[in-house]
Amino acid sequence: MDERLKGYKDVFADHPGVKVVEVFNIKGDAGNAFDRTQHWLTEKGVEHIDAFVCLEASSGKDVAEAVRRNNATDRLIVAMDTDEATLGLVKSGLIDATIAQKPFTMTFFGLKQLDDVHHYPVDLKRDFATDSFSPFPRFVDTGVSLVDKVNVDLYIQGRQEAQSK
């Protein structure tokens, strides 16, 4: 989560009109996302909130529901991941965009690296981040993409095809 938040803050730093008001950890509980969103919209006032950015997959739909209940559907919502509910809310326009990861690719490369460690043992006490002779990369970028109303149907179709296999 820290790296995701840092990524957003790095981008926001180039946009002086964007201000992060509060960051809260829902601790994997979507109910916390709903409750905190309700709090911000009712206690602080809808007119003072322009956007919500969700860093966990479980929070997007609950943030969207709180926004809908407060008739604040003109607020920007950026979610995380491509679960069925989130994609449906992107398609409906309640969520403006979601960041898609590649869970199958992430799993494949993770298992591949474990298999390599098993079949080609190395000294695991080495600092692979600074060792220029390390057999392992310091970081593996499996990619992300932005899903919005323009391309959401492609992701819905891809999800359905993956589930039907």
Q: Model segments located where?
A:
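Short beta-strand elements at the ligand-binding edges of bilobed clamshell
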Residues: 92-104
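A generic structural signal for alpha->beta connector loops
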Residues: 17-20, 74, 95, 143
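Hinge/cleft segment of the Venus flytrap/periplasmic-binding protein
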Residues: 11-12, 109-165
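Hydrophobic alpha-helical
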Residues: 8, 21-22, 27-89
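Short glycine-centered helix-capping/turn motifs at secondary-structure transition points
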Residues: 70, 93, 159-162
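Ligand-binding cleft/hinge of the Venus flytrap
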Residues: 4-16
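Hydrophobic alpha-helical segments within soluble ligand-binding/sensing domains
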Residues: 3-6, 31-37, 82-86, 102-125
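Structural detector of well-ordered beta-strand residues that form the stable sheet scaffold
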Residues: 50, 77-78, 96-99, 147
